[in-house]
Amino acid sequence: MDSPAFFFTFFLWFLLLSATGYSIYVSFGPPSKKLRDPFEEHED
C-alpha cells in the first residue's frame, strides 16, 4: 500500500468520478436550466 502507483491510481479514479459526477450534475441538475438548446434557437 505504500507504492506510488497505488496513490496515483486512486487519484486518477477520484478525478474521473468527480468529473463524471459534476457533468451529470450540470446536465440534469439545477444548473441545466441555464443551458441553451441550439436546436430550439435555429428554425428551418
UniProtKB/Swiss-Prot annotation:
Pfam family, one: PsbN
Cellular location(s): Plastid, Chloroplast thylakoid membrane
Membrane topology per record: Single-pass membrane protein
Intrachain S-S bonds: none
Gene Ontology cellular-component annotations: chloroplast thylakoid membrane
Main location: plastid
Entry keywords, A to Z: Chloroplast, Membrane, Plastid, Thylakoid, Transmembrane, Transmembrane helix
Transmembrane segments: 6-26
Domain of life: Eukaryota
One GO BP: photosynthesis
Role, per record: May play a role in photosystem I and II biogenesis.
Family: Belongs to the PsbN family.
Name this protein carries in UniProt: Protein PsbN
The organism of origin for this protein: Tetradesmus obliquus
